[in-house]
Amino acid sequence: MVATSKQTTQGYVVEAYGNLLRVHVDGHVRQGEVAYVSVDNTWLKAEIIEVVGDEVKIQVFEETQGISRGALVTFSGHLLEAELGPGLLQGIFDGLQNRLEILADTSLFLRRGEYVNAICRETVWAYTQKASVGSVLSRGDVLGTVKEGRFDHKIMVPFSCFEEVTITWVISSGNYTVDTVVAKGRTSTGEELEFTMVQKWPIKQAFLEGEKVPSHEIMDVGLRVLDTQIPVLKGGTFCTPGPFGAGKTVLQHHLSKYAAVDIVVLCACGERAGEVVEILQEFPHLKDPHTGQSLMHRTCIICNTSSMPVAARESSIYLGITIAEYYRQMGLHILLLADSTSRWAQALREISGRLEEIPGEEAFPAYLASRIAAFYERGGAVKMKDGSEGSLTICGAVSPAGGNFEEPVTQATLSVVGAFCGLSKARADARRYPSIDPMISWSKYLDSVAEILEKKVPGWGESVKQASRFLEEGAEIGKRIEVVGEEGISMEDMEIFLKSELYDFCYLQQNAFDAEDCYCPFDRQIELFSLMNHIFNSRFCFDCPDNARSFFLELQSKIKTLNGQKFLSEEYQKGLEVIYKLLESKMVQTA
């Protein structure tokens, strides 16, 4: 991707501030347009971010060393776009959609000015023709399909085509590369169009054709604390703020491995390179618990680590959501994981500072909240013209400095998401993983999930509320115990405290390194939760706090052992019987 003869508009550099250049332009340009800056016989990709008269300000996505006043700049005439088509899955891209495995063949380090196609032009795909000559199609309608892994990848009329098209020619089913013309059409104005398997779309514009509908399906992630206390629906939005070391990245890795969705798009925008390397090493060897295939078969990774240019962080998060929206249009369920949106916000702050804009709180731009809201609004469930439904669930990790949830990025995020999974440093230090604090977390989807599960598990919603009440009461009693000791509280309060601790240790906490406990399917969660509710509704007889504590510790040990056993195995059934017998030995009555 370099300047071509079609790029007639040119300019020259007037001034440079880091990766921000002020350029005098001879011709017509528009905000968001892609430009190329000439330096050392290479072309550096850039984007127009401000237009003032005959001058523009552009942010360069590469190291700007060597750029001098008067350097030639050419403008492409098109916006910053994503290349969309078969072959994106299993791909590893940078923020500009360069395939990193191809760049790795040329050099150990990323050389500036090197750009490669996101979709391989040599790969042959088995194309099945669906459209017929004479049919009238519009944007998003299916021309044909190719098999991409286990998915039928729909080749659609480009979304940049806003007119109805009458198909005049179609190719027969067979094996073709992505640049092969698979159909031709004519618009109402007589314009002739050719369609290939690849289309492009500006990454900063929402990619949508169809009707947005309310979310009505639970996204099972295999984490009991999320599925029970802070559930999320497919097409919902949630965030995972937390201080450094609280386990945000590990939580996102778990979601990418076990979430019950079709495709996961992982945006590592600004996180440490070591964490990205860990993903690249682990994922090809991990199995998807839902299909048994490699996790990479359903994953697309955009790597933009903190060591890469700041400007590319912004493009990486928009690139990720554009790819996710593209697959949603095929009727698939997508999960987008952005780690971390704080780094993206810091990139916005840096660019805003160089543009000399009036700063908002903590020097972030005044439009930060609207940018974050616009990003999360691109999620949701969509009903297509053919009646199929797809969804895009967005999870954004937030890294507030010092774990301060009052800072602007966290507050702007909380105002637009449907669920808040707050990670606590205190819980992480106490080794209570996942360190999601149920006392500060919340979900707007609780009632919707309760309504869905009511048919399968009567009283689910009330049971979850009861568990939350026990947690709140237990936390209050725990604070009193720290002040007056166990002797200063009643036996009834002691029992409530121990029940809340048991629920925390045995239900909310999970061992990510245990083969069984790392992923808890919904049927298993329902059975364990019914056991917890049986304990909540039971009264026990104890002589003193020590006896009560020893009983609940024994109970905790047996339930922890049960969590590590294969579900419905002989050992599991025996362990469950032992637990119920132990409960009966101390039980006074059931409420």
Curated annotation (Swiss-Prot):
InterPro entries in alphabetical order: ATP-synt_VA_C (IPR055190), ATP-synth_a_Xtn (IPR031686), ATPase_a/bsu_AS (IPR020003), ATPase_F1/V1/A1_a/bsu_N (IPR004100), ATPase_F1/V1/A1_a/bsu_nucl-bd (IPR000194), ATPase_F1/V1_b/a_C (IPR024034), P-loop_NTPase (IPR027417), V-ATPase_asu (IPR022878)
Reaction equation(s) it catalyzes: ATP + H2O + 4 H(+)(in) = ADP + phosphate + 5 H(+)(out)
Keyword match Transport: yes
Positions of transmembrane segments: none
Binding site for ATP: G242, P243, F244, G245, A246, G247, K248, T249
Annotated GO MF terms: ATP binding; proton-transporting ATP synthase activity, rotational mechanism; proton-transporting ATPase activity, rotational mechanism
UniProt cross-references to HAMAP family, sorted A to Z: ATP_synth_A_arch (MF_00309)
Top-tier EC class: translocase
Function: Produces ATP from ADP in the presence of a proton gradient across the membrane. The V-type alpha chain is a catalytic subunit.
Stated family: Belongs to the ATPase alpha/beta chains family.
EC nos: 7.1.2.2
Name of the protein in its database record: V-type ATP synthase alpha chain
Alphabetized PROSITE patterns for the sequence: ATPASE_ALPHA_BETA
Record-level GO BP terms: proton motive force-driven plasma membrane ATP synthesis
Keyword Phosphoprotein: no
CDD domains in the record: ATP-synt_F1_V1_A1_AB_FliI_N (cd01426), ATP-synt_V_A-type_alpha_C (cd18111), V_A-ATPase_A (cd01134)
Keywords, ordered alphabetically: ATP synthesis, ATP-binding, Hydrogen ion transport, Ion transport, Nucleotide-binding, Translocase, Transport
